[in-house]
Amino acid sequence: VPMGITLREVIFDIGGGIRNGKKFKAVQIGGPSGGCLVESQLDSPMDFDSLTKIGAMIGSGGLVVMDEDTCMVEVARFFMSFTQRESCGKCVPCREGTRRMLEILERIVAGNGSLSDLDELEELADMISNTALCGLGKSAAKPVVSTLRAFRSEYEAHIVDKTCPSHVCTSLRTFHIDPEKCKGCSKCARGCPASAITGQIKHPFSIDTSKCIKCGACLSACPFGAVYAE
C-alpha cells in the first residue's frame, strides 16, 4: 500500500473489515513491539512521523486487527512474552525489565494482580524505553503502554472484579450449561478431561465448577451453543 494511506482504508476498504460483523476494537501495528491503536486513531496516515506521534510505529509493516472478543491484557502479555524471549540479555533494563513486566502481566491475567501493579508497569515501561541499549528494548513496552492508556478499565476488571470482560483469560472464566439450550447429547461430558460434566442422555447436563479445569473443551464440543463462559 502507498505510504500515507490511513489505517481505516487498509483495514476496512482493502482488508474488508472485521469478520462476521464483529465490532472493531484495536489494531496493533509495527510487529511485536508496536503499539495498539483504537477506533479514534484509524484516520491517522501510515507514515513514520504520524504513527510515532500516537505511540506506534511502522516497524515490520504488519497489522494485527482485533475485535470485541479480544482481551487487551492478554494481548499485552502475549507480545511481552515474545519480546522477553527475544531479548539478547546484554543490557539489564531489557533483560530484567521485560521479565518483571511479563511476571506482572501473567499475575494479572491469572486474577492475582493488584492496582499497584499498573503503576509498576508504567514505571518499568518508562525505565526500559529510556535506558535500554537497542531498538527492541526501547520499544518493548509499547504494547503494554498503549493498552494501559486505552483499555485501563480492562486491566482494572481483571484485578478488582476478577473477571475478563472478553472471556478470554482462562483462570477468570467460569463455564456453565444453559438447560434451555442443552439437548442432552453428552458431547461436552465425553470431551471433558476432568470428568466435571454429568447428566443423563436427552436431559440437561451440568458442570461441577469445583472439578472444572477451565480448559474450554466443553465450549468447543457443544453443537447447540448451550455452554457459555462468564
Show which residues each predicted segment covers.
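Short metal-coordination and nucleic-acid-contact micro-motifs, chiefly zinc-binding Cys/His arrays
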Residues: 84-87, 127-130, 178, 184, ...
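Redox cofactor-anchoring modules in respiratory/redox and cofactor-processing assemblies
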Residues: 1-174
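Iron-sulfur cluster-binding cysteine motifs and their immediate structural context
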Residues: 93-99, 177, 187-206, 217-230
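Non-ligating segments of multi-cofactor redox enzymes
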Residues: 29, 170-171, 180, 185-190, ...
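Short cysteine clusters
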Residues: 4, 88-94, 134, 164, ...
